[in-house]
Amino acid sequence: MQTIALAVIGGTGVYTLSQLDDVQVYEVETLYGRPSGPIRVGMLFGQRVAFFARHGEEHALPPHKINYRANIAALQQLGVSRVLALNTVGGINEAFGPRTLVCPDQLIDYTWGRVSTFCEEVGSEVLHVDFGHPYSPLLRGCLLRAARDVDVSLVEYGCYGVTQGPRLETIAEIARLRRDGCDLVGMTGMPEAALAREKGLEYACLGIVSNWAAGCGDGAEITMGEILSNVATVFRN
């Protein structure tokens, strides 16, 4: 197979990458089961790019039921070395309102019960990977430069608080995340980032702010319609 320059993982509201040309579809089996869906590989701006939807193409997988290990292992089996994760998130920091694009540099993991390592099988090597900087500086740099080159507004920092889901958070929970230093909240950033690090993949996140987190902004009730509408607006622009 020809080298794949980049894999893109789609989040809520991003179930296809319609710009891909000459698409080949791969149904990948891994030691950890099947990934969230077929992986589509095609040409984008002269580069081979892979894409799949983290929640499945019909959004059938809630955050805590996603087979994160199979997703990362499948990309590695296809020869992927760089992964751009699209994550639909809520804004906590007052500077990160709906339809803002953010390239976070830190995260805090509040999830529980998710299989978060490849180091569980008998005979597997136990890896204590350095996770001080959870996102690849190399890939983050590429993303930030690309945004500047095409004059796209992209916030260059932020701490992503990863919660369990699938429900949204309470106002008190968001207040806690704010005190902890979180700027954004979402449900799928972990264990995906840690698994990518264990496999030696360059991994970065592009956060798409779809709504204010509970108790932030105007304090209005958060609806799925608002989330999907704001994500669609970002991609139309």
UniProtKB/Swiss-Prot annotation:
Metabolic or biological pathway, per its Swiss-Prot or TrEMBL entry: Purine metabolism; purine nucleoside salvage
Domain of life of the organism encoding this protein: Bacteria
Residues involved in substrate binding: 187, 211-213
Sample GO molecular function, one term: S-methyl-5-thioadenosine phosphorylase activity
UniProt keywords, alphabetically: Glycosyltransferase, Purine salvage, Transferase
Site (Important for substrate specificity): 169, 224
Subunit structure, as described in the record: Homotrimer.
HAMAP family linked to this entry: MTAP
Family of this protein: Belongs to the PNP/MTAP phosphorylase family. MTAP subfamily.
Name of this protein: Probable S-methyl-5'-thioinosine phosphorylase
